[in-house]
A protein has these predicted regions:
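Short helix-boundary/re-entrant hairpin motifs in multi-pass inner-membrane proteins
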Residues: 81-143, 166-170
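Physicochemical signature of membrane-embedded alpha-helices that form the seven-helix bundle of GPCRs
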Residues: 47, 81, 143-146, 218
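Transmembrane helix-loop boundary segments of multi-pass membrane transporters
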Residues: 134-139, 190-197, 230
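Transmembrane alpha-helix interface/packing and boundary motifs in multi-pass membrane proteins
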Residues: 154, 158, 222-229
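Alpha-helical transmembrane segments of multi-pass membrane proteins
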Residues: 22, 119, 145-152, 198-203
């Protein structure tokens, strides 16, 4: 995960994504989980594969304009590919659930492994060019509509979830949609605030299961941390 977060060029990011996906796939082998979770493996890792291919396509597209570019200076014409690559992994563009959910991974190291693709994708969102889709207003409007739908749907599902565990993916999608909207509005660096809330406040909520009566005030502190977001 650190390799993906601190990757300076797209080649290193592709390698890191493949490595993380491979480790997660090995940990999610059908013999180690329920039949329901095993049935979702092709869908989840199919989405991950598409996101990696989109990242590779964006790398090639960027090289045609600026050979050897870094992730801190993504060419504008390659931005749409990087947006799709990150959006697929976050479940925002298009709306999907690229996360494995089972009782075996409620807490501990399994949760950290689940959040690895999320953290690396948020790092990509924060580095998207400021003029993303500036010359393609139709695509920009379409992506904004899709992102808004994803945010509203995920927020509703999170509020009406039967349990904290079942609502977890929708927390990720809802806040990731806010981060994506920042990039679509030309303020990609502002997405770091939403990404931080997703990971820090979200991790506190995720790990606080089942709740412990004596420290029930701790999740409230995590929620209060969102108040200062722009």
């Amino acid at each position: 995960n650190l390799l993906a977060l601190f990757a300076g060029d797209p080649n290193m990011l592709i390698f890191a994504w493949v490595l993380v996906d491979t480790l997660e796939f090995v940990s999610a082998l059908p013999g180690r989980r329920s039949n329901h979770s095993a049935a979702r493996l092709p869908t989840v890792f199919g989405v991950r594969l598409l996101s990696t291919l989109a990242l590779a396509a964006g790398t090639v597209s960027g090289w045609m304009v600026e050979p050897g570019f870094t992730l801190s200076a993504i060419p504008s014409q390659a931005g749409i590919f990087f947006l799709l690559a990150a959006g697929l992994r976050l479940g925002v563009l298009p709306l999907n659930l690229p996360f494995l959910q089972s009782a075996e991974e409620k807490n501990g190291p399994a949760l950290l492994l689940r959040l690895s693709p999320v953290a690396s994708s948020l790092a990509v969102i924060a580095r998207l060019p400021a003029n993303l889709l500036a010359n393609q207003p139709v695509w920009l409007t379409l992506f904004k509509v899709l992102t808004t739908v994803a945010a509203l749907y995920a927020a509703g599902m999170w509020l009406t979830g039967k349990s904290q565990h079942d609502s977890r993916p929708y927390w990720i999608i809802a806040l990731a949609a806010f981060a994506t909207m920042c990039a679509l509005n030309g303020a990609a660096p502002a997405s770091r605030a939403w990404g931080t809330a997703l990971l820090l406040s979200g991790s506190m909520l995720f790990l606080f299961d089942p709740p412990i009566r004596r420290i029930r005030f701790l999740p409230i502190l995590g929620i209060l941390g969102i108040i200062g977001l722009p």
